[in-house]
Amino acid sequence: MHIRHLGLVDYEPTWHAMQAFTETRTGETPDELWIVEHPPVYTLGLAGKPEHLLQQTAIPLVKTDRGGQITYHGPGQLVVYLLMDLRRRDYGVRDMVRRIEQAIIDTLADYGIEARGDVNAPGVYVGARKIASLGLRIKNHATYHGLSLNVSMDLAPFGWINPCGYAGLEVTRMTDLGVEATLAQVAERLIPHLETRLARPQHETEA
């Protein structure tokens, strides 16, 4: 799996680059993880309802093709896009979501944070507060989009939406939980957990 550290990049061109990568990939194209950070932007998934944006702000809103509802991206949030061919694995998208969640939970545990998933609401939570979101798109058995983990970002813009379509859902970040770490440091811990949790079945890797 190739790891690409792209730094601070605008959302829309990155999304279109993911689409292009997925459209042109072949059976030989290596899977990739794109590690990014975005300037402030709201993204509205395929199931998203505009009324979940509670007030107009200067933050742009992009209607995108991932699953899910509305969320916010901004500086201080670690975003990982997963461009993977599911035909190389023995699991489907639901299991993939659980594996991604567990990789995030494993990463937070490295920092002494106890987190959990929720079978009824994808993402990762600390208590009742959401710390990470997931949203994927599957096309021709290939995935794109991915996860976002709140590290040190300004959480105020979440107050102007119903995060992931849930009114009153509270969010949190690693700095509020006593962790002072850069995005690069958190990515360094998260990537190995993702690689482990998303690994091919053992019988395939031995071939």
From Swiss-Prot:
- Annotated catalysed reactions: octanoyl-[ACP] + L-lysyl-[protein] = N(6)-octanoyl-L-lysyl-[protein] + holo-[ACP] + H(+)
Q: Which Pfam families match?
A: LplA-B_cat
Enzyme class, spelled out: transferase
What is its pathway? Protein modification; protein lipoylation via endogenous pathway; protein N(6)-(lipoyl)lysine from octanoyl-[acyl-carrier-protein]: step 1/2
Enzyme Commission code: 2.3.1.181
Tell where it localizes: Cytoplasm
GO terms assigned for molecular function: lipoyl(octanoyl) transferase activity
Q: Which biological processes are named by the entry's GO terms?
A: protein modification process
Site Lowers pKa of active site Cys: list residues.
130
Which residue intervals define the domain BPL/LPL catalytic in the entry?
27-202
- Give the misc comment: In the reaction, the free carboxyl group of octanoic acid is attached via an amide linkage to the epsilon-amino group of a specific lysine residue of lipoyl domains of lipoate-dependent enzymes.
Q: Could you tell me which NCBIfam families the record lists for this protein? A: lipB (TIGR00214), PRK14342.1 (NF010922), PRK14343.1 (NF010923), PRK14345.1 (NF010925)
What does this protein's UniProt record list under function? Catalyzes the transfer of endogenously produced octanoic acid from octanoyl-acyl-carrier-protein onto the lipoyl domains of lipoate-dependent enzymes. Lipoyl-ACP can also act as a substrate although octanoyl-ACP is likely to be the physiological substrate.
Record family assignment: Belongs to the LipB family.
This chain's protein is named Octanoyltransferase
Q: Which organism is it from?
A: Laribacter hongkongensis (strain HLHK9)
